[in-house]
Amino acid sequence: MNIKLINIGFGNIVSANRIISIVSPESAPIKRIIQEARDRNMLIDATYGRRTRAVIIADSDHVILSAVQPETVAQRLTSKDDLEGEA
């Protein structure tokens, strides 16, 4: 089993195999998901005090906040897939 890791900013790395979705934090439903994760102690804040630009939802019900744009995280995710396919 290959473990693919994705850099989500500031040296923080998550397993690509565990990511369910990468979304913007602007909508009310996502804000509710963040608050519920905080209440359940399942929130991981990887923003280093910066503005949250991406919310990553993992298959373990963890919610990860990142200061990197969702498009950037998705691009890193797909570029890692492309590199693995060539090997």
From Swiss-Prot:
N-terminal signal peptide: none
InterPro entries attached to this UniProt entry: RemA-like (IPR007169)
Pfam families linked to this entry: RemA-like
Domain of life: Bacteria
Family per record: Belongs to the RemA family.
Stored HAMAP family: RemA
Name of the protein this chain belongs to: Putative regulatory protein BH2513
Organism of derivation: Halalkalibacterium halodurans (strain ATCC BAA-125 / DSM 18197 / FERM 7344 / JCM 9153 / C-125) (Bacillus halodurans)
Lineage of the organism: Bacteria, Bacillati, Bacillota, Bacilli, Bacillales
